Amino acid sequence: MAKEAMIERQKKRERLVAKYADKRAALKEIARDEDLPMEDRFKARLKLAKLPRNSSATRLNNRCQLTGRPRAYYRKLKMSRIKLRDLASNGQIPGMVKSSW
């Protein structure tokens, strides 16, 4: 299981991304708009750079909801391969059965 601090850090990043998403999108739109003067676009870039680093969505990791494990993550189920195997073998995931042929 991942350390509690890592899981909490991830949750903090998720909150920051949600908080600054609209502001970040607006500044990016201004910075990309070629109809605006170069000075305004540059100011938008500077404001974007002053936002917190962790407010960028690229800083987020996918983590298992049950264990916090960042690797071997299944997006559809939001869990790692290890917990997926445990729950599936115990019959706790509806519709998932062990394959045999």
From Swiss-Prot:
Signal peptide: none annotated. The keyword Iron-sulfur does not apply. GO terms for cellular component: cytoplasm; small ribosomal subunit. One of its GO terms (molecular function) is rRNA binding. Keywords: Ribonucleoprotein, Ribosomal protein, RNA-binding, rRNA-binding. The keyword RNA-binding applies. One of its GO terms (biological process) is translation. Part of the 30S ribosomal subunit. Contacts proteins S3 and S10. Belongs to the universal ribosomal protein uS14 family. Binds 16S rRNA, required for the assembly of 30S particles and may also be responsible for determining the conformation of the 16S rRNA at the A site. HAMAP family: Ribosomal_uS14_1. This is Small ribosomal subunit protein uS14. It comes from Jannaschia sp. (strain CCS1). The lineage of its organism: Bacteria, Pseudomonadati, Pseudomonadota, Alphaproteobacteria, Rhodobacterales. The gene is rpsN.
